[in-house]
Amino acid sequence: MQAVEMEKKAGNENPMREVVLDKVVINIGVGESGERHKKAYSLLEELVEQKPAITYAKMTIKNFGIRKGEAIGIKVTLRGEKALKFLKDALTVKENRLSRKSIGEGYFAFGIAEHIDLPGVDYDPDVGIFGMDVCVSLKRRGYRVARRRRKKAKIATSHRVTKEDTIRWLESLGVIVE
C-alpha cells in the first residue's frame, strides 16, 4: 500500500491501477409475458441497437399471476464505447446526480422511471412507457486473472476497486455524488 501512495506522490500513475468501465446492464422488468413483453423487447432492441436477452420467472407466484418459466423481463449487457455512450445519456436523465447509497465497491446502479426521458427518444403510443434499471460495473485492468479458465488467481485487496475509486471515476464523468 505504501508503494502505491509513494507512486502517486511522484506523479507516476500505473496504467494497471486505472479504473475502467467493465459493463452496463440494462434491465426492464415487465412482470408479465405477452404483448407488453414483446413491446419492451423491441423498445430495448431499438434503444441500444443490440439483441436483448429474455429473463424468465424462477418460481410461480400466484398473487402476481406469474408462472415458473414465463418470460417476465428483458436485459442487455453493453461493453466498450457503446456502454459509455448509453451511460452518459442515462446519467443526464438523473441530472448527473447520484446518491452515495447507490454506489458500492466497483459498481453503482440507478433507475430510470420513463424511457422517454432519455435524450433522442420520443413517445410512441403503440409501445407505451417503460422504466428500466441501469447497473454499472467497474474494474481495473488485470481482472481477467480471476475470471479466466486456466490458472485462475485471486485479485489482491489493494487492486480491487473501492467505493472511493468508484466515486472518483464518477466525478471524472462530471457526476455529482450526494
From Swiss-Prot:
<dbReference type="InterPro" id="IPR022804">
    <property type="entry name" value="Ribosomal_uL5_arc"/>
</dbReference>
<dbReference type="GO" id="GO:0005840">
    <property type="term" value="C:ribosome"/>
</dbReference>
<comment type="function">
    <text>This is one of the proteins that bind and probably mediate the attachment of the 5S RNA into the large ribosomal subunit, where it forms part of the central protuberance. In the 70S ribosome it contacts protein S13 of the 30S subunit (bridge B1b), connecting the 2 subunits; this bridge is implicated in subunit movement. May contact the P site tRNA; the 5S rRNA and some of its associated proteins might help stabilize positioning of ribosome-bound tRNAs.</text>
</comment>
<comment type="similarity">
    <text>Belongs to the universal ribosomal protein uL5 family.</text>
</comment>
<dbReference type="GO" id="GO:0003735">
    <property type="term" value="F:structural constituent of ribosome"/>
</dbReference>
<dbReference type="GO" id="GO:0019843">
    <property type="term" value="F:rRNA binding"/>
</dbReference>
<dbReference type="InterPro" id="IPR020929">
    <property type="entry name" value="Ribosomal_uL5_CS"/>
</dbReference>
<keyword id="KW-0820">tRNA-binding</keyword>
<protein>
    <recommendedName>
        <fullName>Large ribosomal subunit protein uL5</fullName>
    </recommendedName>
</protein>
<dbReference type="GO" id="GO:0006412">
    <property type="term" value="P:translation"/>
</dbReference>
<dbReference type="GO" id="GO:0000049">
    <property type="term" value="F:tRNA binding"/>
</dbReference>
<keyword id="KW-0699">rRNA-binding</keyword>
<dbReference type="InterPro" id="IPR022803">
    <property type="entry name" value="Ribosomal_uL5_dom_sf"/>
</dbReference>
<keyword id="KW-0694">RNA-binding</keyword>
<keyword id="KW-0687">Ribonucleoprotein</keyword>
<dbReference type="InterPro" id="IPR002132">
    <property type="entry name" value="Ribosomal_uL5"/>
</dbReference>
<comment type="subunit">
    <text>Part of the 50S ribosomal subunit; contacts the 5S rRNA and probably tRNA. Forms a bridge to the 30S subunit in the 70S ribosome.</text>
</comment>
<dbReference type="Pfam" id="PF00281">
    <property type="entry name" value="Ribosomal_L5"/>
</dbReference>
<dbReference type="InterPro" id="IPR031310">
    <property type="entry name" value="Ribosomal_uL5_N"/>
</dbReference>
<dbReference type="Pfam" id="PF00673">
    <property type="entry name" value="Ribosomal_L5_C"/>
</dbReference>
<dbReference type="InterPro" id="IPR031309">
    <property type="entry name" value="Ribosomal_uL5_C"/>
</dbReference>
<keyword id="KW-0689">Ribosomal protein</keyword>
<dbReference type="GO" id="GO:1990904">
    <property type="term" value="C:ribonucleoprotein complex"/>
</dbReference>
